[in-house]
């Protein structure tokens, strides 16, 4: 395992590959039981442990919900030979962090297995790990969609709201975000804290206002690549997952 360092060559940034600056990089891969393929380039997030250290001092009893895009440890490293590092400049996706320095967004996916494992060490037990699409379906989003269809909104307004709500559960869009719920110091008493079929049909669905991006009018494309070019906050969803252990993201090269 090597680490990628960044230095200057004249007026240009350049990368230098050398020995890891800390044993934490190799320790993380060992903890995951992963041997990365030769030539693999990826990220390791060393900020998870200090983050949990801070959170554990704040939350003595309760639930921690993490919603983000990412993978579990094995597919995170085995299926992404070039890692997950991405940049966004004027809503355009790229992979070169050495241009538009200080102006473009730089992001990487979450490696959820380490989030689960490190969370356990700080007393946070995993309750569930699933896609955002499944999570919202469990909460009853289909009831809201049904209410919108039967509502008295004008057709254009109705379709705009249906478009946005369905997009939250699209498997090739926001529905592929992951939802991890962990708990600490809570006595569940054998009860299911995540009941399904909540009767949201009795509630009025939330609707768009002037602060929302109206995807239908923006001609939201069907492809994930098109979605990424419209997404204004520099995040991109991927894949889906079932209950298991999570992963993280980061800036250290492997």
Question: What is the predicted role of each segment?
Answer:
Residues 1-26, 79-88:
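A mobile, often basic/glycine-rich helix-loop segment
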Residues 25-254:
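Long, Lys/Arg- and hydrophobic-enriched amphipathic alpha-helices
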């Amino acid at each position: 395992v090597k680490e990628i360092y960044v230095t200057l060559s004249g007026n240009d940034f350049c990368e230098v590959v050398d020995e890891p600056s800390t044993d934490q990089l190799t320790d993380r891969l060992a903890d995951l039981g992963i041997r990365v393929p030769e030539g693999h380039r990826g990220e390791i997030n060393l900020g998870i442990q200090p983050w949990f250290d801070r959170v554990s001092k704040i939350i003595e009893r309760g639930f921690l919900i993490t919603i983000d895009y990412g993978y579990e440890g094995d597919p995170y490293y085995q299926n992404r030979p070039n890692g997950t590092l991405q940049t966004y400049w004027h809503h355009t996706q790229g992979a070169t962090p050495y241009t538009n320095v200080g102006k473009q967004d730089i992001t990487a996916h979450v490696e959820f297995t380490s989030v689960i494992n490190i969370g356990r060490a700080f007393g946070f037990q995993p309750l569930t790990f699933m896609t955002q699409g499944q999570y919202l379906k469990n909460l009853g989003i289909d009831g809201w969609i049904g209410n919108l269809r039967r509502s008295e909104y004008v057709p254009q307004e109705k379709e705009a709201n249906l478009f946005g709500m369905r997009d939250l559960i699209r498997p090739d869009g926001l529905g592929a975000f992951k939802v991890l719920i962990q708990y600490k110091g809570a006595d569940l008493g054998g009860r299911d804290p995540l009941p399904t079929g909540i009767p949201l049909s009795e509630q009025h669905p939330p609707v768009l206002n002037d602060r929302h991006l109206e995807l239908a009018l923006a001609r939201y494309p069907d492809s994930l690549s098109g979605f990424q070019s419209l997404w204004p906050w520099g995040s991109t969803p991927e894949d889906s997952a079932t209950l298991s252990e999570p992963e993280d993201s980061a800036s250290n090269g492997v």
